[in-house]
Amino acid sequence: VSYVDDTTGKTLKTDSISGTTGSKSSYSTSGNIADYKKHGYELVTDGYPADLTFDNNDTTDQNFTVHLKHQLTPVNPTDPQTPGAPINPDEPDGPKWPARTNYDKTVNETVSYVDQTGHVVAKQHTDSVNFTRTVVVDNVTGEVITSGAGTKAWTATNGDTTFDAVVSPVVSGSVANKAQIAAVTDLNADSANVTETVTYTKVGSLVPSSSDGNFPRVPTVVYPNDPSDATKVTPAGVPTVPGYTAHDPEGHVLTPGSSYQPSDPTKDTTITYTADTQKGS
């Protein structure tokens, strides 16, 4: 009596039995079949007759075959198994259920907003795309089968395979090094996590200065943030100081009430004031 693994084509074991001509065999395949089932097999056909009678042919053996195959179990997020637990309860040291990542994966996006020292200046942005599939687990070997009958390919939850572009938030008094994080398209289950950092630097100021000893104390003017672009500032209003004329770094006269757009929003700009010539009466 041969026990054959139809999945691999190999013979698992062979039992030899004998008896006198015309006698009934007491041999049964049920015990072996039950044991194989405990190890993840399922019965295909039992070719051994229930009431075998030994024949009278001494030259030719009576051969019978029991066919078994590996039991296959579909696994997916809606019908999961406990990862690491024995597939066959009666075989604690045997094959184990696979990790959930074999059929359930999430790709994450994280965007952090920090200053030059790493201090958080705005709420972190997070997003994720989930992918699931159905795999088939071989109950005999623990092999994870990802194609063929009973399996389903990776699909994105809700059909979403994109991280949308993320506009950097405006942080008062600072400018960002990136206006936005670009969109990431065509994500799949094997895509790497996306980790981005946007760094903010404090904006500069207009700094009034004069060599005139009578020049009054004039406060600096911090560059205003551009409300529509975290990387930019808008022109800063030049302080009007009665009796003095303002000049930009290139020496150009700045008219009272005018504004100045700095070339580098993170650098201070010195506005030089010269005393107006007093006219006699």
Q: Residue spans of the language-model regions?
A:
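Extracellular modular ligand-binding repeats in secreted and cell-surface proteins
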Residues: 1-281
